């Protein structure tokens, strides 16, 4: 297991906030985010080495993968939780507009 994955898993285990489903989903999303950061070339990261360039790279990747706006916003919420837990909440912009993430659209334009 990679160091970042392990550290984020332990962070989730020590910070038991929310329902069991929320805790499980958060842990899975953080594992996914850690794997994506590794694939993007950010190796040897620790839980405290989160920087704006990492977040911008992740958001760009998610837009390139054509993920839905709701999925991106949910992942940003998990990143904000991570940043708050390691006392780096100023690293993540407070608004999704900073990253170019538009508002959710609840009516589909067409079929996926």
Ranges and model annotations:
Residues 6-110:
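N-terminal core-binding DNA-recognition domain of tyrosine recombinases/integrases
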